[in-house]
């Protein structure tokens, strides 16, 4: 199979790290959908296609952005009427991966303030919420429970989302 034939289907995803080489909670990878199945790209393909990890990542992110242009989100408000939680759950297998969207901070910080917290306990949900002690304490146990209980686990580690990117939350 040539790289041209899969380029438009290449999607970025976050998967649980199976081999803890870097100590990171999650690692970005790429995959492409074939009707009802998904195939992960092996590093050997990079050499065959004469592509770098950066080439694959850039294309996968571009495709994820296109796939995510029009999405519905569920929100919860606090007692003052401020949005305190945004839930992205399209159930397309890429919800956790949307943490990688380049405009995520820009789009959600107007509602959640900056920086905000994100959680990706499993593949089919991205939770973004205010970075305040009460909200973090309230939602952390549910994130941990979802991680233990749901299939396609990613991580129970909370992430902090800033204008500069995403990092593990140490709170």
What label would you give each PLM region?
Residues 75-77, 117-121:
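Short beta-strand
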Residues 1-93:
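Charged, alpha-helical interface segments at or near domain boundaries
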Residues 82-84, 119-123:
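Short acidic (Asp/Glu) and glycine-rich catalytic loops that position anionic groups and cofactors
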Residues 95-109:
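Short amphipathic alpha-helix segments
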Residues 112, 122-171:
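C-terminal structured domains
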Residues 60, 64, 68, 104-108, ...:
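Hydrophobic, Leu/Ile/Phe/Ala-enriched alpha-helical segments that form helix-helix packing faces
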Residues 71, 107-115:
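Short amphipathic beta-strand starts and helix->beta connectors
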């Amino acid at each position: 199979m040539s790289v041209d034939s899969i380029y438009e289907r290449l999607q970025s995803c976050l998967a649980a790290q199976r081999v803890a080489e870097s100590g990171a909670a999650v690692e970005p990878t790429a995959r492409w959908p074939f009707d009802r199945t998904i195939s992960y790209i092996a590093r050997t393909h990079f050499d065959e296609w004469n592509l770098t990890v950066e080439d694959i990542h850039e294309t996968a992110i571009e495709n994820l952005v296109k796939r995510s242009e029009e999405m519905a989100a569920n929100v919860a408000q606090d007692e003052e009427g401020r949005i305190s939680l945004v839930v992205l759950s399209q159930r397309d297998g890429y919800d956790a991966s949307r943490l990688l969207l380049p405009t995520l901070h820009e789009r959600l910080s107007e509602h959640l303030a900056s920086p905000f917290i994100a959680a990706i306990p499993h593949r089919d949900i991205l939770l973004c919420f205010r970075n305040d002690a009460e909200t973090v304490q309230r939602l952390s146990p549910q994130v941990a429970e979802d991680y233990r209980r749901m299939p396609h686990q990613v991580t129970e580690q909370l992430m902090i989302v800033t204008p500069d990117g995403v990092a593990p939350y140490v709170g």
